C-alpha cells in the first residue's frame, strides 16, 4: 500500500513516507480523498498538514511493536485537530500469526491512552496490508474478529458534514472584487452558517453594520448560500471592508481581541524564541504576534504538564499570544477557520508552528497608563540631542557586543550621552 501512494524517490528508497501524498478513489457508496501522512517523528509537521482537513483518521499500528510514542503523538494531534472518527488499524497481523491475544493487548493499551486524552470511541480492525486481510474483504485467518472490513467501515461511518452549516455565519473576506466602477463586492469562502439576501450583517473587527444586497457566484446570483460555498457579497451601504475582515450576522458576531491562549505544535528545527515577533496567519488575517514563554509542554507518553522555557521540533505546548492589533478569532472547538493558525518566521518566511486557540484573554481594566510630567522631549532638550535606540541583533558570537561597544566609544567621543545595555550583562 505504501509503495502505491509514496511518490517521492527518497520515500521509495527508504521505504518511508516523507511528504503528504493525496490519492482519490471511490466505491459504489462513497468518494474518498486519502492523505497518506508520514509516521516518522521528524516529519510530524507533514502529518499535521495532512490531518488538518480530515474527517476521519486511520491510526496504523505495527502488530509486532504495539503502541509506540509516535502512535500516542499522532493520536493526541488527531484529537487536538478535532477529528472524532478514529480507526485503529493493527497492521502486519500476518507476522504475528494472526494472534488474537496480540491484537486484544494492543487495543487495550491504546484504549487506556485514548481515554486519557479524551478520545471517547475508536474502531479497532486487524489487517494485513501485504495479504489484504480485512481491508476490502473479510479474512478467514481472523475468524475470531466479528467486525467490518476497513473499506466497509469507511463506507458506512457517519461523518458530521452538516455541523458547519448549523453554526453562526462567518465569511473571512479574501479580496475586494471591483471589476468596474458600478460593482463592489467582497469575496470569500463561507466557513460556517448560512446567509440570505436581506440579512443584517456586521463587519468585524470594525463593528460596522449593513445588510446583504446580493449573493453573487460564478453561476449567477443566489438567494441563499451555505458553508463551503465561495461567494461574493454586496452590501446596501458603503461600508469599509477589506481582506482580513470577517462578515457575520449582526446577532452573533465573533469576538475580536489581541490576547489569547493557544495550544502550539512546533514544527521547526529552530526552537521557539519567546517574545520574538512572528507572523501569525489566521483565516485571511496576517498580523505580528509575540509569544510568552510556554505555560507548559505536554509530555506525550504521560500527558504530564512539563515546565518549559521554549519548544523544540515536534513539541506540543500551551502559550499566551499577543498581537500588534486586534484580530477576529474564536476557539478552535467552535471554528477551525477562525481558531486555527500558523506561525511564520519573519526572517526566513518558513512556517514554524501550527496553533489552535483555546480561549480569549482580556486585559485588566484596572491598569491605566500613568502620565509623566517629564516627557521624551524634556529629556532630549536637557541632553541637547535627539534620542535614538540602536538595536544590534545577530547569531551568538557574531560580534554584536564588540560593535556596540565601538559605536558607544565613538558617540562618547562626539560628546553624546549614551547607555549600553548588553544582553549578557542583563542575564549575568
Regions found by a protein language model. Name each.
Residues 27-30, 180-386:
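C-terminal effector/interaction modules appended to NTPase cores
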Residues 40-41, 64-67, 83, 92-97, ...:
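Conserved nucleotide-binding/hydrolysis micro-motifs of P-loop NTPases
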Amino acid at each position: 500500500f505504501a509503495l502505491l501512494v509514496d511518490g517521492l524517490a527518497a520515500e521509495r528508497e527508504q521505504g518511508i513516507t516523507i511528504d503528504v501524498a493525496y490519492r482519490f478513489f471511490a466505491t459504489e457508496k462513497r468518494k474518498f480523498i486519502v492523505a497518506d501522512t508520514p509516521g516518522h517523528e521528524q516529519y510530524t509537521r507533514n502529518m499535521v498538514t495532512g490531518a488538518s482537513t480530515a474527517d476521519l483518521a486511520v491510526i496504523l499500528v505495527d502488530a509486532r511493536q504495539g503502541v509506540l510514542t509516535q502512535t500516542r503523538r499522532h493520536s493526541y494531534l488527531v484529537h487536538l485537530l478535532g477529528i472524532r472518527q478514529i480507526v485503529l488499524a493493527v497492521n502486519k497481523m500476518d507476522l504475528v500469526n494472526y494472534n488474537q491475544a496480540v491484537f486484544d493487548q494492543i487495543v487495550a493499551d491504546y484504549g487506556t491512552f485514548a481515554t486519557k486524552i479524551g478520545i471517547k470511541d475508536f474502531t479497532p480492525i486487524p489487517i494485513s496490508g501485504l495479504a489484504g486481510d480485512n481491508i476490502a474483504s473479510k479474512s478467514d485467518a481472523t475468524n475470531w474478529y466479528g467486525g467490518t472490513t476497513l473499506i466497509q467501515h469507511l463506507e458506512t461511518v457517519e461523518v458530521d458534514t452538516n455541523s458547519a452549516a448549523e453554526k453562526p455565519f462567518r465569511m473571512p473576506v479574501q479580496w475586494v472584487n471591483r471589476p468596474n466602477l458600478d460593482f463592489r463586492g467582497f469575496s470569500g469562502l463561507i466557513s460556517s452558517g448560512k446567509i440570505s439576501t436581506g440579512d443584517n450583517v456586521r463587519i468585524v473587527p470594525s463593528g460596522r453594520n449593513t445588510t446583504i444586497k446580493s449573493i453573487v457566484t460564478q453561476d449567477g446570483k443566489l438567494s441563499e448560500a451555505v458553508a463551503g460555498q465561495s461567494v461574493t457579497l454586496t452590501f446596501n451601504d458603503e461600508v469599509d471592508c477589506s481582506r482580513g475582515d470577517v462578515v457575520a450576522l449582526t446577532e452573533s458576531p465573533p469576538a475580536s481581541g489581541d490576547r489569547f491562549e493557544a495550544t502550539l505544535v512546533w514544527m521547526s528545527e529552530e526552537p521557539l524564541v519567546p517574545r520574538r515577533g512572528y507572523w501569525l496567519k489566521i483565516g485571511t488575517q496576517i498580523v505580528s504576534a509575540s509569544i510568552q514563554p510556554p505555560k507548559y509542554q505536554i509530555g506525550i507518553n504521560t500527558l504530564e504538564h512539563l515546565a518549559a522555557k521554549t519548544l523544540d521540533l515536534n513539541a506540543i505546548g500551551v502559550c499566551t499570544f499577543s498581537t500588534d492589533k486586534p484580530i477576529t478569532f474564536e476557539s478552535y472547538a467552535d471554528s477551525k477557520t477562525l481558531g486555527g493558525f500558523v506561525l511564520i518566521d519573519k526572517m526566513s518566511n518558513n512556517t514554524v508552528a501550527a496553533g489552535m486557540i483555546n480561549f480569549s484573554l482580556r486585559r485588566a481594566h484596572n491598569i491605566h497608563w500613568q502620565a509623566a510630567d517629564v516627557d521624551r522631549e524634556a529629556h532630549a532638550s536637557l541632553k541637547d540631542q535627539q534620542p535614538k535606540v540602536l538595536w544590534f541583533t545577530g547569531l551568538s558570537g557574531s560580534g554584536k557586543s564588540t560593535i556596540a561597544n565601538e559605536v558607544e566609544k565613538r558617540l562618547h567621543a562626539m560628546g553624546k550621552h549614551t547607555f549600553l545595555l548588553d544582553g549578557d550583562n542583563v542575564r549575568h
